[in-house]
């Protein structure tokens, strides 16, 4: 077995090692992908529980907490064919009731602030008619 046969073996086994490396490292194994999906689902569930926990009173949150931990394993739910525990509802940051109570007159002030050419108007401060639309004092009338 000379040096020539060693190079022959090396050239034979190089593609095999590369192929084995691809199978082991590059291609995802189904068990790993399901565990990654489970980890993502668990993280999403924890974020949802933290959002719900912030909205619930503290004594009620203590009662609800253990029930969530009993059913925390998502794999058991999939085998038992449970649906989603908590429906995902998109809610605005400011509640509707508070939005009705707030006085947002930004649209009204913006309409008064600029003229048709985009120039800022300084007139009509406080409802006075002593200034014109460009902020110049009117002496007539």
UniProtKB/Swiss-Prot annotation:
InterPro entries, sorted: Gastrin/cholecystokinin_CS, Sulfakinin
Modified residues (Sulfotyrosine): 117, 134
Recorded phenotype for the gene knockout or disruption: In adults, RNAi-mediated knockdown in insulin-producing cells or all Dsk-expressing cells, increases total food intake and the number of feeding bouts over a 24 hour period. However, feeding them the CCK antagonist SR 27897 does not result in a further increase in total food intake and feeding bouts, as in wild-type adults.
CC annotations in GO: extracellular space
Domain of life per record: Eukaryota
Propiece residues: 34-73, 86-111
GO annotation (BP), single: positive regulation of cytosolic calcium ion concentration
Modified residues (Phenylalanine amide): 82, 122, 139
Entry annotated with the keyword GTP-binding: no
Molecular functions per Gene Ontology: neuropeptide hormone activity; neuropeptide receptor binding
UniProt entry keywords in alphabetical sequence: Amidation, Cleavage on pair of basic residues, Hormone, Neuropeptide, Secreted, Signal, Sulfation
Coiled coil: none
Record's subcellular location: Secreted
Induction profile: Up-regulated 24 hours after starvation and then appears to return to normal expression levels 48 hours after nutritional starvation.
Pfam families recorded: Sulfakinin (PF08257)
Tissue specificity as recorded in UniProt: Expressed in larval brain tissue localizing to cells in the anterior and medial protocerebrum. Expressed in cells in the brain lobe, optic lobe, subesophageal ganglion, thoracic ganglia and the eighth abdominal neuromere. Drosulfakinin-0 is expressed in the central nervous system including the subesophageal ganglion and an abdominal ganglion.
Signal peptide: 1-33
Family of the protein in this entry: Belongs to the gastrin/cholecystokinin family.
Function as written in the Swiss-Prot or TrEMBL entry: Involved in diverse biological roles including regulating aspects of gut function, satiety and food ingestion, hyperactivity, and aggression. Regulates gut muscle contraction in adults but not in larvae. Functions downstream of TfAP-2 and twz in octopamine signaling pathways to modulate feeding and male aggression.
Descriptive protein name: Drosulfakinins
Lineage summary: Eukaryota, Metazoa, Ecdysozoa, Arthropoda, Hexapoda
């Amino acid at each position: 077995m000379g040096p020539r046969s060693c190079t022959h073996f090396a050239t034979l086994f190089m593609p095999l090692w590369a192929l084995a490396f691809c199978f082991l490292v590059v291609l995802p194994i189904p068990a790993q992908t399901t565990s990654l999906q489970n980890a993502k689902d668990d993280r999403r569930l924890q974020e949802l529980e933290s959002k719900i926990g912030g909205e619930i009173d503290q004594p009620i949150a203590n009662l609800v907490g253990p029930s969530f931990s009993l059913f925390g394993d998502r794999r058991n739910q999939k085998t038992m064919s449970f649906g989603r525990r908590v429906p995902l509802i998109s809610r605005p940051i400011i509640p509707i009731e508070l939005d009705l109570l707030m006085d947002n007159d930004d649209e009204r002030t913006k309409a008064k602030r600029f003229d048709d050419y985009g120039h800022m108007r300084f007139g009509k401060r406080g409802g006075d008619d002593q200034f014109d639309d460009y902020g110049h004092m009117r002496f007539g009338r």
